[in-house]
């Protein structure tokens, strides 16, 4: 019996390890592409609104471009470190480490979508305040329009990122997770031999 299970352990281990590494490689590539997308958006805003800030003499448009540049200073400050972190990411994580990293990523993007709604709402609040504040009407409208634009983009960005990561995990990672059984001795692979289920808990991942 032991001679039978010894090679079975190694076959089963590599049947999990190989697709797990592939999943992590794909997850890292997704993060890199997302950060490049965020960085591209920030760069575009620097160029377009930078020109606008420099050439528009006054009025609502001036404050709109001003806020776009300032806001995307934060975006580029997130995109560059995010890309570097993804580039340095290791695809050789254990299943438990991969699941933790995946759930953390999904949670971050999901929380961010809620924050993005707050940014959009703040933009509408500023526009509303502009109606009763004639002295700062242009500034409030310009800043408000910028927050609506930037918040709207980030909402679509974060929601799209969450959906991409979540679908990717459902397609492969969570299927791998279902082949693992938790027991008092740790994590083990689980098979069905014939019609009777069999589990072995001494193979640690």
Over which residues does each language-model region extend?
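Loop-to-helix transition at the N-terminal end of transmembrane alpha-helices
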Residues: 59-75
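Membrane-embedded alpha-helical transmembrane segments of multi-pass integral membrane proteins
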Residues: 41-51, 71-81, 85, 115-122, ...
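Long, highly hydrophobic alpha-helical transmembrane signal-anchor segments
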Residues: 31, 35-64
């Amino acid at each position: 019996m032991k001679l039978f299970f010894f090679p079975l352990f190694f076959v089963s281990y590599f049947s999990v390890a190989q697709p797990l590494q592939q999943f992590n490689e794909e997850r890292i590539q997704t993060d890199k592409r997302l950060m490049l997308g965020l960085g591209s958006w920030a760069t575009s805003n620097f160029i377009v609104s930078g020109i606008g800030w420099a050439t528009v003499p006054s009025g609502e448009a001036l404050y709109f471009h001003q806020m776009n540049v300032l806001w995307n200073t934060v975006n580029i400050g997130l995109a560059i470190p995010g890309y570097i972190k993804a580039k340095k990411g290791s695809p050789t994580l254990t299943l438990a480490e991969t699941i933790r990293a995946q759930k953390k990523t999904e949670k971050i993007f999901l929380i961010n979508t809620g924050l993005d709604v707050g940014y959009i709402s703040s933009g509408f609040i500023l526009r509303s305040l502009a109606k009763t504040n004639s002295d700062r009407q242009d500034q409030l409208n310009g800043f408000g329009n910028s927050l609506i634009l930037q918040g709207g983009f980030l909402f679509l960005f974060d929601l799209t990122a969450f959906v991409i990561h979540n679908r990717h995990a459902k397609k492969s990672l969570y299927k791998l997770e279902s082949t693992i059984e938790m027991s008092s001795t740790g994590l083990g692979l689980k098979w069905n031999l014939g019609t009777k289920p069999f589990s072995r808990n001494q193979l640690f991942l």
